[in-house]
Amino acid sequence: MLSVVIATQDSERALLPTLAALVAGAAAGLVREVIVADASSRDATVAIADEAGCCVLDLTLPRGPRLKAAAGTARASWLLFLRPGVVLESNWVEETRRFIEEVELRKDPQVKAAVFRAGPLGSATIEALALLRAALGAWPDASQGLVIAKSLYDALGGHRDVQATERDLLRRVGRKRLVRLRTGTIGIT
């Protein structure tokens, strides 16, 4: 149902907590595979990803083309893009599955995408800042991840070779197709 794509480069310390948070999704049958698109790391990033059972692609490409190439190998019909160090809250599996099922049941020609809420639920300061950013028209941050139908991702042309590749993709998805999930993310550095 879901292929997770993570672009890494010397990310050994940040990758482990991100992968640990995905175990519940794999156990529940939501996560089909995790693809790590690595840019020739010199630390233990590749060893950690390999030991965790991830598909590791060694791609000496800029971030955008690396993400696009990794997404091109994905076998699931939905993609979840995460940055190393982003840890999803424990309720992410149920909410993500519900979001995907609702979109697929509606067979809406305007297939939607979703981002996770910035910060853990109950963190008043982070929630207030995220609401203020949204009210002022700011786009979600790359640390919020992105759940997107592979068909929509492909139709949009995927990630491009631009400076803020995640933000560029979100803008092409558009506000009307973008849903903000209640599940939060926690950034680990």
Regions found by a protein language model. Give the residues of each.
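A recurrent flexible, glycine/aromatic-enriched loop bordering the glycosyltransferase active site
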Residues: 109-121, 130-155, 186
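A conserved acidic beta->alpha catalytic loop
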Residues: 38-46
